[in-house]
Regions:
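Short, glycine/charged-rich "phosphate-handling" switch motifs in NTP-dependent
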Residues: 177, 189
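A short, surface-exposed alpha-helical micro-motif characterized by mixed small hydrophobic
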Residues: 171-173
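Conserved ABC ATPase "signature" region
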Residues: 28, 80-99
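A short, proline-enriched helix->beta-strand linker immediately N-terminal to the Walker B motif
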Residues: 123-127
Length: 236
């Protein structure tokens, strides 16, 4: 879950208590020094969070936010950093990347903001990408586009990806292996197809059984009206 993932690179608040063991490429992460964790964050392990507006600075342009990471981790400055930022935006499917560099987060759609977050996560060539419910705040169409993008990046760049989600349909679609967690502990794990076809744990079995299947029964023409709405608007 997100708390476990955040504890991996020491991103929990100071009053959090971390127990157990997390090993990454032979390195013990729980209890590691801030210096060692800082070397891993962004370089080896990057995060994509559920709501990009909570991660992007509303006062800074997209260019500044991407280039800040490039400067901090790679020492890129000026035109070199700008060229790399444009490459990253093109890589994640942002149209008119050069023009978008000067945009601020509020000027982008939800899908575009999430693509910017993915670009920032990829900026320093991480080996592991931790995606925490990255499509929950998006509509179904944009959600599918982001999932396709992540799958494509995983295949082309050889990324390992830890995808945190409660959506079983997404698990089926994107995961090679699945871990089922209850109360912060893994109760079952294995190849996705095997776990879905033959769940073993008493928690996993009803969880998968609750997944909607088939099509709902058609509504009869004579069925009573349950709810109606007129002149309904949604705005942000």
């Amino acid at each position: 879950n997100p708390v476990t993932a955040l504890s991996t690179v020491g991103l929990l608040s100071d009053n959090a208590i971390g127990e157990g063991s997390v090993t990454y490429l032979g390195r013990q992460m729980i209890g590691a020094s801030e210096r060692d964790l800082r070397a891993v964050r962004g370089n080896d392990i990057s995060f994509i969070f559920q709501e990009p507006m909570t991660s992007l600075n509303p006062l800074h342009s997209i260019e500044r936010q991407i280039c800040e990471s490039l400067s901090l981790h790679q020492g890129l400055e000026g035109d070199n950093a700008r060229r790399r930022a444009i490459e990253l935006l093109n890589k994640v499917g942002i149209r008119n990347a050069i023009e978008r560099l000067t945009a601020y987060p509020h000027q982008l759609s939800g899908g575009q903001r999430q693509r910017v977050m993915i670009a920032m996560a990829l900026a320093n060539g991480p080996e592991l990408l931790i995606a925490d419910e990255p499509t929950t705040a998006l509509d179904v169409t944009v959600q599918a586009q982001i999932l396709d993008l992540l799958a494509d990046l995983k295949a082309k760049d050889g990324l390992s990806m830890l995808f945190i989600t409660h959506d079983l349909a997404i698990v089926r679609r994107i995961a090679d292996r699945v871990c089922v967690m209850k109360g912060g502990e893994i109760v079952e794990s294995g190849p996705t197809a095997e776990v879905f076809a033959n769940p073993q744990h008493p928690y996993t079995q009803p969880l998968l059984a609750a997944e909607p299947k088939g099509r709902p029964d058609p509504v009869a023409d004579t069925a009573p009206e349950v709810i109606s709405a007129e002149n309904l608007r949604v705005w942000f």
